[in-house]
C-alpha cells in the first residue's frame, strides 16, 4: 500500500473542482450509505485490465477507450448503451485486423458523470448561477434550485452505473459480441456510407479472414473468444466524495481499489502538485490515466509518475495526450523523451478531442473531424520519430446518429449541427464518424507496423 495513505487522506490536500454541498449532514449520510453498497467492479477485473495495459505499453496490444463526454440521467436507456457498445466493438474489430494485436476495450461508461468546468459560474443574460457540474452533482436546468449540489444524485448515479454495468456484462458475454455478427454490422454500415469504396477493401479482407477461420473449424461455437469479449469501464475520478465511498480493500491482496470503475483518470485541471485528486489516486491499485497537455512540463510529469507509480509497475499508468491538432507535434516529443529517458513503463494514448473544440458561427460548440484526425496523425508521427509505441486512442463518441462534430465523410456542416445536437457537455463523434476514424486509425497503425518491419530488417 502507498505510504501514509488512506481513502480519506485526500481531504488534507487542495481539492479543486469539487462542489460545495450546502448540508454537510446530508452529504455524510449519503457517503455512509455508499460505503455499504456492493462494489461495482471487482479487484481481480482491475488487475486483469492492468495486465492487458502492460501488454499495450510493451507494444503488444492497443487501447480503445471511448464513450460519452458526460453520461446523463435523462438519456439513460438500454438502446443508447447498446449502440455505443456496438460501435466500440466494430471499431475494435477493425483495429485488431489492422494491428494484428489484441485491442483492449474500455468504455467511458457506467460512471462518467462529473465534469470540471472552466468557470464555477455560468451567465445567461443578466442571470448568473453556479455551473452545471454533471448529473451526479447538480442539474442542467438553468434555475437556482437545479444548480444546488445534491448528494442524493450520487445514489442515483450509483444505481445507473450498476444497471449499465449489468447490461454491458450481458452484452459482452451473452453472444451479442459474436465476432461474425460484429463484422456484419460494419458491412451493413459501409453499404450505406459515402466511404464504401475507400474502406470496403479492408472490410472484405476481414470477411475473408473470418471465412478462412470458419473453414478451419475456428468459429464462435468452437472458440469462446469469438462469442464474447472482455470489456472494461472507466471515468474521470473527479467527485472524490463518491470515489472515497466506493473504495474497498481487496480480501485477497490487502490492496485498496476504487470499485466504481476498472480504470480511473486524472484530468488536466486536477493533476497539479499538492492535488487532492493525485493524493487519492496514488493509493488505489486501479490502472490510472493521466491527461497530458501543453501546460504539463516534462519535469512535472516525471514527478507525477514517481508519485503515482513509485514501483514502476507496467500497466499502472496510461498517459493520454491532449494537445490540439496544431500543437501535438511540437509539444509531445519532450514528454516522450523525458519518460523514455527515465525508464517509466507507460502506455501512450491519444485524446484528439479536448484540444480541438471550437465555437461555430451559430454558437454551437463543435469539433471538426479533420482536426481530430490531424491530431491522431501527429500523435503517430511523434511516436514513429521517437521509436516509441503509439498505443491507444481516447475519444468522446456515441452510437447514436447525432450531429455534434462537423465534417467526416458524412459531411456534417455547421448549419447541420442543430439537427441532432444532444450532448450534455462537449460534442461527440457519431457512429459513422467513429467508424471512419477506426478505418483511418487502421491506416496509421499499418504505417507504424511497416516502419517497425523496415527497422527490423
Language model feature labels by segment:
Residues 48-50, 274-277, 304, 333-335:
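Glycine-rich, charged/polar anion/phosphate-binding loops
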Residues 70-71, 75-324, 367, 375, ...:
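Active-site-facing alpha/beta catalytic cores
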Residues 58, 260, 283-285, 342-344, ...:
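Short, well-ordered loop/turn elements at secondary-structure boundaries
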Amino acid at each position: 500500500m502507498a505510504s501514509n495513505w488512506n481513502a480519506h487522506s485526500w481531504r488534507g490536500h487542495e481539492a479543486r473542482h469539487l462542489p460545495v454541498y450546502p448540508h454537510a449532514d446530508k452529504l455524510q449520510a449519503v457517503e455512509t450509505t455508499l460505503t455499504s453498497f456492493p462494489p461495482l467492479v471487482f479487484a481481480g477485473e482491475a488487475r486483469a485490465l492492468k495486465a492487458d495495459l502492460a501488454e499495450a505499453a510493451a507494444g503488444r496490444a492497443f487501447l480503445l477507450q471511448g464513450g460519452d463526454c458526460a453520461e446523463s440521467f435523462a438519456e439513460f436507456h438500454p438502446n443508447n448503451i447498446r449502440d455505443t457498445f456496438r460501435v466500440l466493438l466494430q471499431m475494435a474489430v477493425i483495429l485488431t485486423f489492422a494491428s494484428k494485436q489484441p485491442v483492449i476495450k474500455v468504455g467511458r461508461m457506467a460512471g462518467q458523470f462529473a465534469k470540471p468546468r472552466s468557470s464555477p459560474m455560468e451567465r445567461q443574460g443578466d442571470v448568473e448561477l453556479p455551473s452545471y457540474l454533471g448529473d451526479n452533482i447538480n442539474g442542467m436546468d438553468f434555475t437556482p434550485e437545479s444548480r444546488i449540489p445534491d448528494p442524493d444524485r450520487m445514489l442515483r448515479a450509483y444505481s445507473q452505473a450498476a444497471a449499465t454495468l449489468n447490461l454491458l456484462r450481458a452484452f459482452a458475454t451473452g453472444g451479442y459480441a459474436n465476432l461474425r455478427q460484429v463484422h456484419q454490422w460494419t458491412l451493413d454500415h459501409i453499404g450505406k456510407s459515402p466511404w464504401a469504396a475507400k474502406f470496403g477493401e479492408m472490410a472484405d479482407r476481414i470477411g475473408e479472414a473470418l471465412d478462412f477461420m470458419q473453414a478451419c473449424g475456428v468459429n464462435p461455437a468452437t472458440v469462446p473468444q469469438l462469442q464474447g469479449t472482455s470489456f472494461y469501464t472507466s471515468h474521470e475520478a473527479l467527485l472524490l466524495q463518491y470515489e472515497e465511498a466506493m473504495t474497498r480493500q481487496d480480501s485477497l491482496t490487502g490492496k485498496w481499489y476504487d470499485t466504481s470503475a476498472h480504470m480511473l483518470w486524472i484530468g488536466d485541471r486536477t493533476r497539479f502538485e499538492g492535488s487532492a485528486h493525485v493524493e487519492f489516486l496514488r493509493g488505489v491499485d486501479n490502472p490510472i490515466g493521466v491527461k497530458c497537455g501543453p501546460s504539463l512540463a516534462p519535469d512535472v510529469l516525471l514527478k507525477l509518475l514517481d508519485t503515482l507509480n513509485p514501483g514502476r509497475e507496467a500497466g499502472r499508468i496510461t498517459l493520454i495526450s491532449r494537445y490540439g491538432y496544431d500543437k501535438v507535434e511540437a509539444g509531445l516529443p519532450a514528454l516522450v523523451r523525458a519518460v523514455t529517458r527515465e525508464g517509466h513503463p507507460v502506455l501512450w494514448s491519444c485524446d484528439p478531442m479536448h484540444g480541438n473544440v471550437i465555437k461555430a458561427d451559430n454558437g454551437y460548440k463543435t469539433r471538426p473531424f479533420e482536426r481530430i484526425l490531424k491530431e491522431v496523425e501527429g500523435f503517430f508521427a511523434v511516436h514513429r520519430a521517437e521509436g516509441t509505441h503509439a498505443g491507444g486512442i481516447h475519444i468522446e463518441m456515441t452510437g447514436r446518429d447525432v450531429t455534434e462534430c462537423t465534417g467526416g465523410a458524412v459531411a456534417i456542416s455547421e448549419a447541420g449541427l442543430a439537427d441532432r445536437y444532444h450532448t450534455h457537455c462537449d460534442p461527440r463523434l457519431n457512429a459513422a464518424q467513429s467508424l471512419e476514424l477506426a478505418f483511418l486509425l487502421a491506416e496509421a497503425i499499418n504505417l507504424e507496423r511497416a516502419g517497425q518491419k523496415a527497422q527490423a530488417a
